[in-house]
């Protein structure tokens, strides 16, 4: 996975994240650290001032108090909220779709589409 670049939208016009080691940067110039995975915690910002995600089992919580379930990975689907009322991402074949109607491509790899294997690898990398 190394130094692949994430693009947002079907036209791949905007770089979202660049994964290098365990650091994820925002933008093409890598000027800001978004996530730094340390154990089971992911921090926002270079000073690690705020806990953004805390992965426990297959649940991902938002905030330090783990008061809200942000994502719950169930098979190939990722759901938002505790009631799983809305499908946030559903990857099928080599595309990652946003929303329940799969109307928009949410993410695409540089140098090819995001495959199902790469999507699984990305989720695995973020959870380990």
Locations of regions flagged by a protein language model:
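Long terminal segments
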Residues: 1-23, 27-32, 38-40, 46-50, ...
